[in-house]
């Protein structure tokens, strides 16, 4: 199922055309997919840049046209004995941490001359994609195990977890791991287990969504992972999209609660003792709705509006 398929399900369940997702999942992958509904679709631009964490299975000895188990096999190479050694695998994965450049898979949604790369690849065209920067923040090996490869033979699979920057292609990482280890490799399983501050345990299946749509709702402040303030004396200024002074907002720490509570107006609110940072994005609450996002300009000692909602984004059930 593609990310677009998920969007279509959400549109039907909520009876709302304005639905978007923050960060495409490969059709083969499972896990966290943040979906914005109604006015919350304007938050997409602020959610897609968050780092993500994956649990990935990498199987060695074969390469495929899509760099995962969905594509046709393009090459088979013998697998060095060291790949089956857990100590070697652990050291290799841990040393992947850092910055680098990678060429995205040709079967990706990147646009080349106005058309998606995977559409051109399916049409038999030769795709030349430029390398892009990426960063692995941390990486660890969970397991080295025997597995059944796409060709029906027994192979070696590394199961690892990685936290990566926006725009990192896990299929490219697996492909390049194989090349670096003098064989070839593909992604045999992939699950996104965190997106920003939202973890897998916060999410619900599509089946659960169909039964109880409110069970999937998450406070937008938690999804954004930013500090926030209640507009008590400055609500009118926020409504009009005016700039705010330092003294207008008393910041609170980012929310750490899981799914939204029956009323989130005061749930887990911890006052912040740190002053606003230059260019920091903060949320402003009016009547228990996320009414606006403001950016702090240190030189002017004021907050500048970046996104103001006409009715605001709901944070909790009406009590």
Residues covered by each model-derived region:
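Accessory RNA 3′-end/elbow-binding domains used by RNA modification enzymes
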Residues: 1-21, 25, 29, 155-157, ...
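Non-catalytic RNA-recognition surface used by pseudouridine synthases
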Residues: 1-30, 39-207, 299, 311-319
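Phosphate-centric recognition/catalysis
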Residues: 35
């Amino acid at each position: 199922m593609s990310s677009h398929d998920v969007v279509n399900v959400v549109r039907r369940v909520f009876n709302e055309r304005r639905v978007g997702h923050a960060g495409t999942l490969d059709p083969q992958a499972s896990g966290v997919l943040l979906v914005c509904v109604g006015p919350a679709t304007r938050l997409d631009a602020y959610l897609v840049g968050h780092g993500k964490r994956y649990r990935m299975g990498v199987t060695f000895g074969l390469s495929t046209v899509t760099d995962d188990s969905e594509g046709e096999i393009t090459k088979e190479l013998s697998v060095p004995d060291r790949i089956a050694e857990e100590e070697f695998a652990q050291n290799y994965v841990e040393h992947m941490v850092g910055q680098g450049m990678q060429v995205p898979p040709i079967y990706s949604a990147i646009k080349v001359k106005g058309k998606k790369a995977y559409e051109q690849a399916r049409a038999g065209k030769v795709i030349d994609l430029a390398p892009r920067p990426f960063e692995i923040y941390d990486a660890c090996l969970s397991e080295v195990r025997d597995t059944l490869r796409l060709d029906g033979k027994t192979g070696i699979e590394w199961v690892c977890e990685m936290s990566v920057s926006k725009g990192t292609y896990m299929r490219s990482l697996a492909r390049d791991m194989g090349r670096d280890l003098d064989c070839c490799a593909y992604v045999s399983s992939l699950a996104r287990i965190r997106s920003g501050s939202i973890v897998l345990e916060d999410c619900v299946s599509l089946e659960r969504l169909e039964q109880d749509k409110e069970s999937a709702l998450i406070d937008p402040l938690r999804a954004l992972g930013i500090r926030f303030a209640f507009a008590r004396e400055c609500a009118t200024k926020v409504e009009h999209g005016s700039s705010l002074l330092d003294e207008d907002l008393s910041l609170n720490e980012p929310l750490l609660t899981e799914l939204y509570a029956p009323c989130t107006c005061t749930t887990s609110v911890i006052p912040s003792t740190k002053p606003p940072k230059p260019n920091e994005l903060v949320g402003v609450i009016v009547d228990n709705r996320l009414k606006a996002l403001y950016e702090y300009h240190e030189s002017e000692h004021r907050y500048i509006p970046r996104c103001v909602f006409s009715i605001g984004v709901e944070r909790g059930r009406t009590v």
